[in-house]
Swiss-Prot record:
GO terms for cellular component: membrane. The gene is DTX20. Keywords: Membrane, Transmembrane, Transmembrane helix, Transport. InterPro entries: MATE_euk, MATE_fam. It is found in: Membrane. It is a multi-pass membrane protein. Pfam families: MatE (PF01554). It comes from Arabidopsis thaliana. CDD domains: MATE_eukaryotic (cd13132). GO terms for biological process: xenobiotic detoxification by transmembrane export across the plasma membrane. Belongs to the multi antimicrobial extrusion (MATE) (TC 2.A.66.1) family. Coiled coil: none annotated. The chain crosses the membrane at residues 37-57, 75-95, 120-140, 156-176, 185-205, 214-234, 265-285, 296-316, 337-357, 381-401, 413-433, 438-458. This is Protein DETOXIFICATION 20.
Length: 491
């Protein structure tokens, strides 16, 4: 009877809190939701820029070793590491769904168990991806790369195995901490790591002349240092409510986590590989050198803006999953609206900035007049890419928060690879629009995908989503009173 009374009291408290929230004016609601959004988005954006900075610093130091080394680095990271990164980051997205909804439902003891289950699943995935790096030489030769570049890339690929394994604790700890809006710590340590990486790269490459060995050693330190700090923070008191120690329960109910991880991996890697396909298609066009240089500049600019959008993807997935887990359908819908509006507002500003600047911004990256002219010609497409990318990742974040990854994977496959790429091939090769035609086709694929996700979001029954989320939470939950490090005989 006492337990029943406790449940009733908790329900009344929740209801009273909701009623107070409903009585707030629209300005106050927007302000409160925006603060919750930026608490996750700002550190997520900063972390992505710091991680991107580590790669850029390494590229700069390796570039001074020679053009062959630079080409090998670019191929290794653009083709091999992006391939595995897309899969593992996508698979970690499942943890964002599970932890976010469990945290919203106040089932705090489950977050640590979900984290450990994701470590098991992603470690298995990383081991399965190892042959890609071990046999990098034959793979790159089969893709038509020059043998002299492949010889260096083969060495780099073995170093990258260590970076690939760092993604397991890195991505999972990020999702675990983001679900609790505690990801500030990640931004602090990645900033320090970037500064140390610059110093160690100079020391090992420029001062001691250790070449590729020095550059990759510094990079490994830069990737693993933040992870060590995050793991210490999680396991040594920074998350007392959600980390209850290592548990044998991590080995139970792995199948639902694996299924959701595979759906998440399919959803995100199909998005991340899309730009790689654009580069491959452009490389086969006539007079591709100038086009590739211009496209590389445009993609670099687009990637910088994309980090803002990916920050909002992380934030809205947390907000939606938290609200669904807490049984608040209105809150999930409102969080979606605020995230889309905020990201779209930033996208509109950047859209007009790049339309106005056109080719002038290219002189930051090149001194070639031909390349600058090509960038100016591509600037309208770059501006539209930035505009679309301010909405599409946010809607993908809503999908992660709600657990729709499997559906969105099919949407991405159809829109990108059955619509966007074929249209790009026709416009680029048949109609003769060259790189512009390929990009228009790819943009059309993104536009169709954005429209489909928008319709899916608008037609969502949020009350039904709450019921589905709570049903899943109750199915997998471990009672808090139970010893988390034991599995009872009846199980």
């Amino acid at each position: 009877m006492a337990g029943r009374g406790g449940e009733l009291t908790e329900a009344l408290v929740k209801k009273t809190g909701r009623e107070e929230e409903d009585e707030l004016g629209m300005k106050e609601k927007v302000w409160i939701e925006s603060k919750k959004l930026w608490v996750v988005a700002a550190p997520a954006i900063f972390t992505r820029y710091s991680t991107f900075g580590v790669s850029m610093v390494t590229q700069a130091f390796i570039g001074h070793l020679g053009p062959t080394e630079l080409a090998a680095y670019s191929i290794t990271f653009t083709i091999l590491l992006r391939f595995s990164n897309g899969i593992l980051l996508g698979m970690a997205g499942a943890l964002g769904t599970l932890c976010g909804q469990a945290y919203g439902a106040k089932q705090y003891q489950m977050l640590g168990i979900y984290l450990q289950r994701s470590w098991i699943v992603l470690t298995g995935g990383t081991i399965c991806l190892m042959p890609v790096f071990i046999f990098a030489g034959p793979i790159l030769l089969a893709l038509g790369q020059e043998e002299r570049i492949v010889r260096v890339a083969r060495v780099l690929a073995l170093w990258v195995i260590g970076i690939n394994f760092s993604f397991v604790p890195s991505f999972t700890c990020q999702m675990f901490l983001q679900a609790q809006s505690k990801n500030k710590i990640i931004s602090y340590v990645t900033a320090v790591s970037l500064g140390l990486h610059v110093f160690f790269s100079w020391l090992l490459v420029a001062h001691f002349n250790f070449g590729i060995t020095g550059a990759m050693t510094s990079m490994l330190i830069a990737f693993w240092l933040p992870i060590i700090v995050q793991l210490l923070y999680v396991t040594c008191g920074g998350c007392k409510d959600t980390w209850r120690g290592f548990s044998m329960l991590a080995f139970k109910d792995l199948w639902p986590v694996l299924k959701l991880s595979l759906s998440s991996g399919g959803m995100l890697c199909l998005e991340l590989w899309y730009n790689s396909v654009l580069v491959l298609l452009t490389g086969n066009l006539k007079n591709a050198e100038v086009a590739l240089d211009a496209l590389a500049i445009c993609i670099s600019i687009n990637a910088l803006e994309m980090m803002i959008a990916l920050g909002f993807l992380a934030a809205v997935s947390v907000r939606v999953s938290n609200e669904l887990g807490s049984g608040n359908p209105k809150g999930a819908k409102f969080a979606t609206l605020i995230a889309v509006f905020t990201s779209l507002s930033i996208g509109i500003v950047l859209f007009f900035v790049f339309l106005f600047l056109r080719g002038r911004i290219s002189y930051i990256f090149t001194t070639s007049e031909a390349v600058a002219a090509e960038v100016a010609d591509l600037s309208p497409l770059l501006a539209f890419s930035i505009l679309l990318n301010s909405v599409q990742p946010v809607l993908s974040g809503v999908a992660i928060g709600a657990g729709w990854q499997g559906y969105v994977a099919y949407v991405n496959l159809a829109c990108y690879y059955l619509v966007g790429i074929p249209i790009g091939v026709i416009l680029g090769y048949v109609v003769g629009l060259q790189v512009k035609g390929v990009w228009i086709g790819m943009l059309f694929g993104i536009f169709v995908q954005t429209c489909v996700l928008t319709v899916m979001t608008l037609r969502t029954d949020w009350d039904q989503q709450v019921s589905t989320s709570l049903r899943n939470i109750n199915r997998w939950v471990v009672p808090e009173s139970r010893d988390a490090n034991q599995i009872s005989s009846e199980e």
